[in-house]
Amino acid sequence: MLMHTVAETPTFSRQADKLFNEGERRELIDYLAEHPLAGDEIPGTGGVRKMRFGASGRGKRGGVRVIYFFGGEGVPIYALLAYSKSDKIDLNPSERRAVATLVAAIKLQGKQSK
């Protein structure tokens, strides 16, 4: 099975440090690497996806939400944000705009490096 590279943003890394133990984090990264289209696309974000991930016995429904971007074959998966469902359910409009801006910069960087 094809495995994609997963790049963590500094924000994701800080959030993941608080939400996952080492094994859970490795499991999440491996899952994303194997299933880059696993989550649902968030409208208005330029292709950002949201995936549920169970952590520390919380299960998928009550677990963690992982926000990430996959731009296609040959492009890394960018882990952008992670948060507990108890902290928030969805991204607010300003967060959506912020991730859309970040994704636009990632896409531009990708075009410039080709």
Predicted stretch roles:
Residues 1-23:
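Arg/Lys-rich, positively charged N-terminal/basic patches that mediate binding to nucleic acids
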Residues 70-114:
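Enriched for short, Lys/Arg-rich terminal
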